[in-house]
């Protein structure tokens, strides 16, 4: 792969993953995906006592509808139990198919929740940060992700090309979704827009908003 493509994609990855963190709270909300390392990180935080419960949310999405025959949340739950989490400390939400639904469905499940850390993939941190204020204004939410390096440690489920496609699509959503009421507005720096335009010119367009 061309070195400039990797450079531009790394720029997107690092920007989208910035600002993540966690603190003691009421629940760890796990936004499921194709990357089970998010489940592993949730188990690590749970063992450290960050929160007394895991709320795992996700049905299937673009990347997992052909990967597993059961909802993502059930796959992640099995992973958490295998890592020693007490099943009684896990709640499931199996309807959500995107970040907005992850948050709104968990809100319906536990409306009393006020402080939580939402876990996702590193390249999805910004998307979740921008979606939270729209879907759950009263939530004191933090967003965190496992420490995964691009490009060397990307998921082999989708590979480097798939992750670049995903990030290009995420930037597209950051630009378009505020007008649709899905996310809060966010001013992307010129260098991020330039990286996005370059990657689109290299035909990383499979995940753009349709």
Annotated model-derived regions:
Residues 154-210:
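A conserved mid-domain beta-alpha-beta active-site/ligand-binding segment of alpha/beta enzyme cores
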Residues 1-167:
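A structural signal for short, hydrophobic/glycine-enriched beta-strand patches
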């Amino acid at each position: 792969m061309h070195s400039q493509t990797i450079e531009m994609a790394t720029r997107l990855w690092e920007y989208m993953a910035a600002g993540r963190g966690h603190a003691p709270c009421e629940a760890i909300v796990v936004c499921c995906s194709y990357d089970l390392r998010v489940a592993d990180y949730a188990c690590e935080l749970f063992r450290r006592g960050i929160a007394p419960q895991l709320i795992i949310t996700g049905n299937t999405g673009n990347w997992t509808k052909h990967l597993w025959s059961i909802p993502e949340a059930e796959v992640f739950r099995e992973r958490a139990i295998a890592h020693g989490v007490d099943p009684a400390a896990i709640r499931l939400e199996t309807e959500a198919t995107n970040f907005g639904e992850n948050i709104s469905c968990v809100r319906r499940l536990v409306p009393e929740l006020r402080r939580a850390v939402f876990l996702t993939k590193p390249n999805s941190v910004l998307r979740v940060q921008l979606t939270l204020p729209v879907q759950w204004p009263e939530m004191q939410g933090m967003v965190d992700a496992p420490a995964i390096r691009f490009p060397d440690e990307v998921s082999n489920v989708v590979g480097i090309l798939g992750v670049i496609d995903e990030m290009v699509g995420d930037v597209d959503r950051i630009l378009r979704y505020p007008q649709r009421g899905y996310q809060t507005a966010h001013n992307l720096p010129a260098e991020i827009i330039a990286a996005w335009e370059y990657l689109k010119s290299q035909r990383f367009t499979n995940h753009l908003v349709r």
